[in-house]
Each structure stands twice: as structure tokens, then as C-alpha cells.
A protein has these predicted regions:
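Terminal targeting signals and extreme-terminal segments of soluble enzymes
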Residues: 1-120
């Protein structure tokens, strides 16, 4: 079982430049104040961004990731991450991601840069 398997991730491909991942709510994801833990939010954003960046037949490991937490997710049947290509260069792929709950209010945003290293 991989780390990502723990989250029961489901994927919806919108187009070659956009995808959405979702995970079902689990009590295990809550922090001490009863909101979804920031680590879960960042993991989902990282997976969505990474899946998208690595979908072009290239190996593209993460160079950097910046996350901004905007509001807590308190109650939600699912947690979603929508990743979109901002720029796809020959050496760097930049992906923006928004994380939100069922209410569609943005809880966090991230920008991740990936280094295109080689073909798969």
C-alpha cells in the first residue's frame, strides 16, 4: 500500500491541462480544532499537481511547493483539489491548485514547480 492509497483518491480528468482529485472525509483527517489537517490538504494538492505535471510522458519531480491556507474545511463529504497547468516549459512545469470542500469555497491554494528530467 502506497502513501497515497491511504487517502482513497479518486481522479477526474477535465482536459490535458486540468484535473480534479477528491478524497472522502475521514475522522482521522481532523486536527485539534476539528478542521481538516493542513498536511492532508497539502498532500491532496501535491498529488493533484504531481499527477498533472507527470501526465505528459515525462518524469517531473517537485522543485518547490507554496501553499496558502485561506479557511478551514470543517464539514464536507469530500475534499477536492483542482490542479491546472499555469506554464509548461521544456524544463519547468508550473501548476496551480485549489483545495475546497463540498461548499466549493476555496480553503487553500498552492503553486508547485516541477523539474522535467526525462521521458518515462
Amino acid at each position: 500500500m502506497s502513501f497515497s492509497d491511504y487517502f482513497d483518491i479518486e481522479k477526474e480528468i477535465i482536459n490535458e491541462n486540468c484535473l480534479i482529485l477528491k478524497i472522502p472525509f475521514k475522522e482521522d483527517y481532523l486536527n485539534k480544532i476539528g478542521a481538516i489537517h493542513g498536511g492532508v490538504i497539502m498532500t491532496l494538492a501535491d498529488n493533484a499537481s504531481g499527477d498533472l505535471a507527470n501526465s505528459f510522458g515525462m518524469v517531473a519531480p517537485t522543485l518547490s511547493m507554496t501553499t496558502h491556507f485561506l479557511r478551514p474545511i470543517i464539514e464536507s463529504k469530500y475534499i477536492f483539489a483542482k490542479a491546472e497547468i499555469l506554464k509548461k516549459g521544456k524544463r519547468i512545469i508550473t501548476v496551480d491548485c485549489t483545495v475546497y470542500g463540498d461548499d466549493k469555497k476555496i480553503a487553500a491554494t498552492s503553486r508547485t514547480e516541477f523539474s522535467v528530467t526525462r521521458k518515462k
